[in-house]
Curated annotation (Swiss-Prot):
GO terms for molecular function: beta-tubulin binding; microtubule binding; molecular adaptor activity; protein kinase A regulatory subunit binding; protein kinase binding; protein phosphatase binding; RNA binding. Residues 1-29 form a transit peptide. The modification Phosphothreonine is found at T398, T484. Residues 338-359, 542-551 have a biased composition (Polar residues). RII-alpha binding site, predicted to form an amphipathic helix, could participate in protein-protein interactions with a complementary surface on the R-subunit dimer. This is A-kinase anchor protein 1, mitochondrial. One of its GO terms (biological process) is positive regulation of meiotic cell cycle process involved in oocyte maturation. CDD domains: KH-I_AKAP1, Tudor_AKAP1. Residues 62-115, 333-437, 473-495, 509-551 are annotated as: Disordered. Testis specific. One of its GO terms (cellular component) is membrane. It comes from Rattus norvegicus. Residues 558-622 form the KH domain.
Amino acid sequence: MAIQFRSLFPLALPGMLALLGWWWFFSRKKDRLSSNGKQVGTLKVGPAIEDRLPTEEACPGVLSVTPSVTQPPGKEEQRSMDRPLSDPPALPRTRQVRRRSESSGNLPSIVDTRLQAGQCSDENSKVVLSLMGDEAKSIPLGRPLFPKDLSFPYEAVEGCKQESALGRTPGRGWLSQCAASGENARETGGAEGTGDAVLGESVLEEGLLPQECVSEVEKSEFPILAPGGGGGEKVRSGPPQVDELLKKEEYIVGKLPSSFVGPVHSELVKDEGALVPQVKGSQDRSLARELDKDKTLPEKDQIEQTAFQIISQVILEATEEIRATTVGKTVAQVHPTPGTQPQGQEESCVPASQETSLGQEIPDPASTRTGATASPSAGAPPPKTYVSCLSSPLSGPTKDQKPKNSAHHISLAPCPPPVTPQRQSLDGASNPRGDDTFVTCTSNNSQSVLSVTSLGLCSDPVSTSRLEDSCTETISSSGDKAVTPPLPDSTEPFSNGVLKEELSDLGTEDGWTMDTEADHSGGSDGNSMDSVDSCCGLTKPDSPQTVQAGSNPKKVDLIIWEIEVPKHLVGRLIGKQGRYVSFLKQTSGAKIYISTLPYTQNIQICHIEGSQHHVDKALNLIGKKFKELNLTNIYAPPLPSLALPSLPMTSWLMLPDGITVEVIVVNQVNAGHLFVQQHTHPTFHALRSLDQQMYLCYSQPGIPTLPTPVEITVICAAPGADGAWWRAQVVASYEETNEVEIRYVDYGGYKRVKVDVLRQIRSDFVTLPFQGAEVLLDSVVPLSDDDHFSPEADAAMSEMTGNTALLAQVTSYSATGLPLIQLWSVVGDEVVLINRSLVERGLAQWVDSCYASL
């Protein structure tokens, strides 16, 4: 296909150019045939006065007359007229200055009047000024070259008078004032029909010659050739008051703004025989561009507003189409309300700097088209336009895809079926009809912007856990009063912003709610330790959307899986701009984010949350890319219940169920009651840094004490061993002795201390999860004749567990909620079960656990 295109393109392009050339040639020929009956004469001039004024040298030296003064052209003039426009003769000129007339809007009326009078000649008929004879010299441009009996049409005179008040270009001399007004009307008429304006010739742009200028013309001495004959008669008079008129002109021009005048560069070509003014096509196009730019400021603002509205509509229409295609639903389509807005409102959301006074009615084709589109006829179908009202053009999603706080009320509702938009006035905009919702957004500058949006909630089925992917709407009236439409009785209830029937696309596991989205939405930038080793409940309450819609989708238990990611693999796991994490979330359907630790940068946590199917799929994808990554779950599950006062479970680092982990015993209450730490957990390395910071902080005087009465379960800083300060929790209070019992949450153990020795703890010191896990030995109880373990049993337990790493596994939980564990010690190649060892030594007895095994 490409070879055929390359072979045909060189032939097609010349053919098209040739076809256009023939069409242009015959159309021009037809125009010349129709204009043969209308002849244009020229004014032949003789030698000019040699002493010219210095200020007149910068003015063009070509004059033109009105079509009403016509004479049969000579041979040389006929050849000049028959010459094609594409090859104009060279035009010797001095520096030519061209200006834009602010009263160009008056020209069409002049042209229409002249056309009705039958005085408008063809646009190709040009009046040329030929300098005949060997004694031809430059014409003094400061002098007009018209006879005294030359008549001007009244309409052209009036138009020229209006233009003369707007300004003149400095240095133009009398030529810009005394040129023929009829020629200006003729040339402008040609530009009106073809879109090009002829300005190459020296036509009348400024206005008619003032009365004193006419009197000076009558007194001037010029060799003027009669229109019919070849000779001429000379009229002598006294010298004119040229300097006075030039001063007047410069004074008027000096008062004009610089935007009214504009210099244009022209060519300087010298001809031997004759001076023939012609206008090139490039100059025509240049003038057309100048005339297009020559509009008032309100008109430009209107055009900018209309263009901004059209671009916004196109972009938002494409966005709505993509969303509608993704969700597989039909979005209700409505057209904008009529463009009649009260003062202080606009049709589009534009910055305040682009606003114009709405009290002014500016005729603009773009605004006319907008009005026609806004109120179509009843028979014609209205255009399908999607309009979104934004309080600011720069508003958009934040980096973490969370919606920004807004002053408007947010409501979620299912997408209604498409309705047929009807013509409606602005008065009824505040009262929506059918399923159409008219949204009024109020920006900071207190200007309401009215537009129409389609009522609906669209969600990405691939990312069901992202509330920010859903399309919510801001619904308010013109008085900024929130209006929440009642939810219709629909058989398609919502669950977390997703239709129930859409859950089948991802399987039945997608029905679980995601209330923890607000707690763990930080992604790779999250620094909250509460989301790293949290012990969240397995059952979550219904989301607000589910409660409103009254739906009860199938509940699926959440699986939380956390893996350690070394520092050198974190960047690859996140991907460039988070692309790989987004790919994992969209492909697996699970919620995945990376959590950083506050006191260490060597290891970070990858949190995976979702149904079993989603978690397995995510782990499979991660394992394929990172074969060296350990996918063991280090997440600590929650405890069923705790009889003892405790902190929220998001702050504790507990042992995982059914998984053997390495631990060290940091405190021993008795032979069967221990506190252990997971020294291989990534958060354990930050404990040493935390101890140093707390020591430096609480060694200084002036730290406030705990308020009295002391609240149970409060976290505080308490003195530890060897002058250290440790984190502790109050578990009991004794008001009669002003003492409390505390439990060290990191190093374990209970202690009874005075209240005044405790200190309030800083919030950043409780960020790290509590490292001490309180456990009980499983299947081991004291001897039958003792209520407590003997000192020998305690000593034997300390000997077997002291200063060594052990292996622990949670098998069940006690009635108080403490985990029951099996504890092993590794001696060389031999693994010893400490629970059994106590029994074999006669220090305890073995009993089958009365609790159900995990």
